[in-house]
Amino acid sequence: MIRTFYAFALVVLLTGVRTAVAQVEDPQLSMYMYNPVYYNPAAAGSEGVSRLQLVQRTQYVGYTPTITSDGGAQSTQLISFNMPLAGIKSGIGIYAFNDRIGPITNQTVQAAYAYRLALKSGTLALGVQAGFYSKGYDYGQLRPGEPADPLIPTGQISQARPDFGAGVYYNTTDYWIGVSMKHINQASYVLGTDRSVNPLSRNAFLTAGYRLGIGYDIDVQPSVLVQYSTVGGVTSSNVSLNLVGTYANRIWAGVGYRWQDALTATAGINLLRDNSLRLGGAFDFVIGGTQIKSATSYEILLAYAFPALDSRKKPIVRTPRFRY
C-alpha cells in the first residue's frame, strides 16, 4: 500500500506541474493537511471528533502596492467546524472565510454534509456542500489615468451568489485520499459595467497523505495537495508537497514545497491533557516570482477538539413538575 501511495503521488505531481498559477477564489493554505473540510466536504466527520478551527494567513508580508498606500498583501481569515454523526453514518461541517487582496474582497459561508460508508479496510465518504459566495471590489483604491471617465465605476460594489461543491473521500487509520470540486455551478458576477462579467473558476482538488510510524513515539506524515482550475477556457494547476514529523502525538514540525512558488516550514504543539488544543504556525519563503512578491508569508492555526459525549450516561431530564 505504501508503494501504491507514493506511485500515485508521483503521477499526480507529474501531471500537475504544467503551470503554477492558482485562482484566488479559494485562498491557499500551507497547513492544508489540518483543514480537510475546507478542501473536501466529504471529509466532514472523518477525524472522529468535533473540531473548531481558526486560521489567519498573511500573504507576502510587507508588500507595498504602487496604486494605494494602505497595503495590497493578501490576508485571509478562515473558521471551520465539523463533527461526526455516527448514529446516521454521516458527518457535517461548516466553514467561512474572509479573503482580501488589494481592492478585491472574497467571502463565503459553506455547509457540508458527508455520508460515510464503512468498508472492510476503511471508510468511503460522499459529500456535498452548499452556501453563498460573495465578491466585492473597492474602486476607490484605483488610480485611473482618466478619473473623469464616466465608464469607470466608483465606490464599493459587491454581489453574493449561491455556490455548490462535491467530493469523495476515503480514509483509514494509516492514509487518506480525496477528490473534490468547488464552484460547480460557476456563478457569475457583474462588478461594474455590464461588460465586466466575472465567473468563478471551477476548482478541483486532490488531497492525499500517509501516516508512517518510524519509532515508539515518532511518526511522519507525507502529504500532497493538487489544485486544478478552469475558467473561460483557461486552465491552471498547483502542487504542494509536505512532510510533517510528530513526537509523542504532541509536538510536530515539517517542511514543504509549493511548486515554483515557495518553501514552507510548519511547527505546532497539541496542548491539554487530551491533546485537544492545537496551536500551529507556518512560514513561507517565496522563491518564485520574487520580482512582484514580498519574500515571506505566514499562517497561524488554532483548533480545539470537543470531548466526545458519553452515551453511557443518561441525561438528566428536568420538568416544571419534578425539579431535582
What positions do the PLM features span?
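Bacterial Sec-dependent N-terminal signal peptides
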Residues: 1-26, 243, 322-324
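Subset of outer-membrane beta-barrel
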Residues: 23-324
